[in-house]
Amino acid sequence: MECCLSEEAKEQKRINQEIEKQLRRDKRDARRELKLLLLGTGESGKSTFIKQMRIIHGSGYSDEDKRGYIKLVFQNIFMAMQSMIKAMDMLKISYGQGEHSELADLVMSIDYETVTTFEDPYLNAIKTLWDDAGIQECYDRRREYQLTDSAKYYLSDLARIEQADYLPTEQDILRARVPTTGILEYPFDLDGIVFRMVDVGGQRSERRKWIHCFENVTSIIFLVALSEYDQILFESDNENRMEESKALFRTIITYPWFQNSSVILFLNKKDLLEEKIMYSHLVDYFPEYDGPKQDHAAAKQFVLKKYLACNPDPERQCYSHFTTATDTENIKLVFCAVKDTIMQNALKEFNLG
């Protein structure tokens, strides 16, 4: 009988060891997929960052994929010009030549979301308007209304885009703007580990959908548009965009769901800040700024400190990087550093080292 029990005990022990081993294996396999949640207010660059991951770590964009963006580029051009035409009226700016108001009426007669081609008379109207002194003044005052960052990029390159055989470049695709509604996921494999990036809509109306994404988040990547220090919200005419972004970051970093997730700050659109800081002074929007004017390095550090001050836990590290999401080389370098941070934290958290 004792012999029998001993054999049973041995078998039970062996089974327990197998179960333990399998549990360890399952835990390890579960961690072979790392979930990265991209957060930030609308137009901070989250979708552009995911496109970069597809270019750098995925299959990129085939000619067929690129053809799928032609309509979107055309729509972005119409949308940008229509935004400026509306602003001309709001800001009471006159056209350089009076008859150009008729061209403006022509461009406004089209619903930009239905645009599928780019030809005369609309092509000529948009080219003529972009050269108009009044529209240029309106463009210079773009912080006073809503205009996409890519407006100048496309409108300055119409000679290429108007060609019959036009095929969008990767840069055209990176710059193409379509507001994210709902949740987009992009998984990619890196060194045998699946990085699952989740991009959620940034506009206020989209944020209630985030709750479904909160489970098992390895890292939060929070994007800040540095260039928004002097801009107002898309959803509200009197709120500073950066203040809204900062309030959101403060909420995110204190959520109980994310206590074990590493936090990475991407201070994005540094190229736009460097351009803008020369004529739009930080102190006019943040009176507590006491650094030099027209100094982009001082401005970047000031904004970084503002965000880091939102973290109530001195023990919790926030990793930060200054980025230009439309610059593939910059994102390649930054994500290389970020990958190491994410991996180290995941190993530490789940004792897989």
Curated annotation (Swiss-Prot):
Q: Which domain of life is it from?
A: Eukaryota
Sequence similarity: Belongs to the G-alpha family. G(q) subfamily.
Q: Where is this region: G5 motif?
A: 323-328
Q: What is its main location?
A: other
Region annotation G2 motif: residue ranges?
172-180
InterPro entries (UniProt xref): Gprotein_alpha_Q (IPR000654), Gprotein_alpha_su (IPR001019), GproteinA_insert (IPR011025), P-loop_NTPase (IPR027417)
User: From which source organism is this entry?
Assistant: Drosophila melanogaster
Give positions of region: G4 motif: 264-271
Keyword Transcription regulation: yes or no?
A: no
- Cite the positions of S-palmitoyl cysteine lipidation: C3, C4
Summarize the protein's role.
Guanine nucleotide-binding proteins (G proteins) are involved as modulators or transducers in various transmembrane signaling systems. Could be the transducin analog, an amplifier and one of the transducers of a visual impulse that performs the coupling between opsin and cGMP-phosphodiesterase. Could mediate a subset of olfactory and gustatory responses.
Query: What is the designated name of this protein?
Result: G protein alpha q subunit
